[in-house]
């Protein structure tokens, strides 16, 4: 869905995107359902896990994205060390002819939480190598600042652990990250339903990245459309400016 004409597009590094909903491809039942969901979402940028994709294969995810004119964003999902992540990013650059990468370095398979030490190391190496790095990080304002200082083009704090659907567990930290950031803040992971996506935008995020909330919904295309509307609604509400919260009631019409 196109953004409101009065609102600017999402800008990351030297590129602009009309949609502020970034989709993932993991967990889809099949390519047909994934295609319906991607179209319904209006996304222009979609992540692809390089460890699960054969770039030279036949009609797969990459072919689908090309046909839909959606920019693929390779990610380093499954990597546990900086060395693994850097190698995966380099292979993705060769396979997809892009220096953009969603950087993931997780500490373990149980929590899938980012390993801050390995993540920062990988980010520094990839930025030095000329990559446009979008790191999946903890909801830690200090780490987010370190990643920005390292040269990352955006920071992508989690709302909750990947695939949990728990929503935004620490909204205050997300607000602190946004307040201090000089690059786009993209809420990544933990989204469960449309209200979570709207809240992310109301908190100040520039965009939302999600996969499981759509691909494992009962009706993925319908949920994708809901997420697109929610992201747009949250952004519009933020730009409009909410009323201040009050302890006592205040009539909207004269009482006498």
From Swiss-Prot:
It is an enzyme of class 2 (transferase). GO terms for cellular component: cytoplasm. Keywords: Cytoplasm, Schiff base, Thiamine biosynthesis, Transferase. Its main location: cytoplasm. The active site is at 102 (schiff-base intermediate with dxp). 1-deoxy-D-xylulose 5-phosphate binds at residues 163, 189-190, 211-212. Its EC number is 2.8.1.10. CDD domains: ThiG. GO terms for molecular function: thiazole synthase activity. Gene3D superfamilies: Aldolase class I. Pfam families: ThiG. Homotetramer. Forms heterodimers with either ThiH or ThiS. PANTHER family: THIAZOLE SYNTHASE (PTHR34266:SF2). This is Thiazole synthase. The gene is thiG.
């Amino acid at each position: 869905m196109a953004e409101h004409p009065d609102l600017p597009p999402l800008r990351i590094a030297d590129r602009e995107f009309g949609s502020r909903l970034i989709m993932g491809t993991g967990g889809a039942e099949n390519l047909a359902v994934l295609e319906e969901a991607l179209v319904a979402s209006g996304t222009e940028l979609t992540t692809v896990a390089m460890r699960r994709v054969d770039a030279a294969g036949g009609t797969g995810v990459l072919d689908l994205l090309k046909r839909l004119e959606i920019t693929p964003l390779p990610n380093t999902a499954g990597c546990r060390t900086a060395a693994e992540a850097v190698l995966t990013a380099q292979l993705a650059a060769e396979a997809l002819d892009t220096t953009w990468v969603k950087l993931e370095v997780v500490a373990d398979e149980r929590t899938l939480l980012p390993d801050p030490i390995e993540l920062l190391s990988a980010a520094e190496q990839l930025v030095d190598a000329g990559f446009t790095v979008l790191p999946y990080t903890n909801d830690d304002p200090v780490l987010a600042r370190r990643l920005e200082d390292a040269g990352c083009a955006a920071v992508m704090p989690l709302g909750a652990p990947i695939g949990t659907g728990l929503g935004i567990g620490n909204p205050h930290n997300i607000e602190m990250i946004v307040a201090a950031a000089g690059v786009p803040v993209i809420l990544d992971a933990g989204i469960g339903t449309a209200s979570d996506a709207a809240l992310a935008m109301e908190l100040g995020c520039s965009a939302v990245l999600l996969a499981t909330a759509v691909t494992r919904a009962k009706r993925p295309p319908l949920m994708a459309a809901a997420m697109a509307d929610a992201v747009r609604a949250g952004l519009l509400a933020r730009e409009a400016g909410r009323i201040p919260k009050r302890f006592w009631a205040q009539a909207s019409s004269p009482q006498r």
